[in-house]
Amino acid sequence: MSTDARFWIVVPAAGVGKRMGADIPKQYLDVAGKPVLQHTLERLLSVRRVTAVMVALGANDEFWPELPCSREPRVLATTGGRERADSVLSALTALAGRAADGDWVLVHDAARLCVTRDDVERLMETLEDDPVGGILALPVTDTLKTVENGTIQGSADRSRVWRALTPQMFRYRALKEALEAAARRGLTVTDEASALELAGLSPRVVEGRPDNIKITRPEDLPLAAFYLERQCFE
């Protein structure tokens, strides 16, 4: 594999965040004086080795043009799809002709605004010579139960369970083909690693930070603001 592989970032941002119950998509909600997506893009653009960030937007996104990062030279945009995998695939298709087959693509959730530059760079450095790639993840510390109809059926072995975070980093061609194959089979993939797993590959995990949270519910907003403030003093 070429040692000249570049690093691209894909940010699926076409969702509306129904669980937030807000009037605007959650990626545009204010946290500590800035929209969530602005925070996220600033963090990603702080990584020097990133060639460009491709953002997959909703078809009628009226908020994007107002975002300062939308005018950054390294920020590109395309129209996303209904599901996360559709948006990622749209972004990868938009990168055709720019990204080489062996280039790395890091897919990052728009709503993970607390990701740190150190975590992204460590993911790159750890996996850049890996044949498959991998993801930021966090070992599970809680006891996990399998439940059916409200009744506990068993306990998971938490020593073997990690919580998937983002970015998730894979070769351009391998990721695109894995997502296309899953779509042809009608399979739902909730993250990029799942698509690679279905293709018979074994992504690696790189331990990330517990404050790399995803904005999902209203109570996540003040928590994210707290983490952002705390990170300023590190």
Curated annotation (Swiss-Prot):
It comes from the Bacteria. Pathway: Isoprenoid biosynthesis; isopentenyl diphosphate biosynthesis via DXP pathway; isopentenyl diphosphate from 1-deoxy-D-xylulose 5-phosphate: step 2/6. InterPro entries: IspD (IPR001228), IspD/TarI (IPR034683), IspD/TarI_cytidylyltransf_bact (IPR050088), ISPD_synthase_CS (IPR018294), Nucleotide-diphossugar_trans (IPR029044). Keywords: Isoprene biosynthesis, Nucleotidyltransferase, Transferase. GO terms for biological process: isopentenyl diphosphate biosynthetic process, methylerythritol 4-phosphate pathway. Disulfide bonds: none annotated. GO terms for molecular function: 2-C-methyl-D-erythritol 4-phosphate cytidylyltransferase activity. It catalyses: 2-C-methyl-D-erythritol 4-phosphate + CTP + H(+) = 4-CDP-2-C-methyl-D-erythritol + diphosphate. PROSITE patterns: ISPD. The record marks 19, 26 as: Transition state stabilizer. It is an enzyme of class 2 (transferase). The record marks 158, 214 as: Positions MEP for the nucleophilic attack. Its EC number is 2.7.7.60. It holds the Pfam family IspD. Gene3D superfamilies: Spore Coat Polysaccharide Biosynthesis Protein SpsA, Chain A. Belongs to the IspD/TarI cytidylyltransferase family. IspD subfamily. Catalyzes the formation of 4-diphosphocytidyl-2-C-methyl-D-erythritol from CTP and 2-C-methyl-D-erythritol 4-phosphate (MEP). PANTHER family: 2-C-METHYL-D-ERYTHRITOL 4-PHOSPHATE CYTIDYLYLTRANSFERASE, CHLOROPLASTIC (PTHR32125:SF4). This is 2-C-methyl-D-erythritol 4-phosphate cytidylyltransferase. The lineage of its organism: Bacteria, Pseudomonadati, Pseudomonadota, Gammaproteobacteria, Methylococcales.
